[in-house]
Amino acid sequence: MNQSLRFDKKDRDLLVKINEVIDSGNVSSAEQETFRTSLHPHGIQNMVSTHEERMAMAEVNLLQRLNDGTGVEARLSALKTLHEEVLYSAQTPFRFNTSRVLIQLMKEIVRARGNEEEQLRLIHDFQKVAAGNPRIVRAFLSKFFLLEMPEEWNQKTMDDHVHDANTMGRKNSTYLVMDARVKGIRRLTVVYYNFVDSKVVYELYEAAHIMGISVRLGIKFKARFHDRYVEFLWTPKGFTDTKSVLDFLKEPETEALMQEGRAVEDWAREEVLQTLEAFNAKHAAEISKEWGIEVPLLSEKEFDDYVGMGQTTLIRLSEFVHSQLLPLVEAEAEKVKQELLCASAEDQGVLQERLKKLDELTSVVLY
């Protein structure tokens, strides 16, 4: 009864549709038709679905494609649909800031899967914000620690050193650009190590064009200088569009440089894999002895699956090892907590120290 009073049927119907997409990873064929980029948000789509519903489904559709390994064109198409829905169909002069809050709210809705009460609350907030009332939007900007940006989108905001999933980051290029828009960043420099793939550059620049963000390409190299390694960042300039960047990467001199960079990355990958072998041969037993957990041998294939399209680095290796050990550590910690319930005062001190020791086994320690 209480839930019925707090959330209306529209909230619950939208929750069902969103969770169907989250669980299946796909939007129904009928709903997919409303995401066709050839259809204007103010056109025939208004006859088959509401503005709020289309925005919600466009956002969850994109978020699912960002994480399911979908191809570049599918991600870019989903991003374009989202951009058109939250910007061009908005009946408010506060549309840029409204779109930023709506995207953040949908991310929270997806994260809250499994907690129906929290999802319904967020969906109710989503539908309130979708109306574009400046007072409500400003309240949610503050809640999510987002600065209000001018609706002319002419602010001087930048981030001159970020990484996507192809290097040290966790987000593919489309996701990175979408998050930059939410944060109000207008200029972005995305850094890669030693080389960059033309497919990655295509996605990055096309996504930036869709979202109205100025993006620059940076490639970090290492070189020897006075018997030491120094790092320097190369940021080529003078590009007018995606095609001009891709043409530059196809130039013989640039291709030769990229091939050398690939060779460096291949060498670095082999070094990391040798470290994985050393972990299995030596360090796993040491961790088992020190922390009292049975550490399994880790396979190269599992590590490759964990890294995905990202860079094979020692930091990624330490994070992978930690992800494999975490369930074992949690199980051991739960066992110690149960022992604490019936332990003597003297034993409780020992068990508390054991819990503290288990809590110290982080990816930073492993690194």
Language model regions located:
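Non-catalytic, alpha-helical, charged scaffold/linker segments
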Residues: V27, S244-Y367
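Aromatic- and acidic-residue-enriched segments that line the glycan-binding/catalytic groove
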Residues: R228-G238, I315-H322
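An N-terminally biased module of ancient metal coordination in phosphate/nucleic-acid-related enzymes
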Residues: M1-Y229, P236-T242, L249, V350-Y367
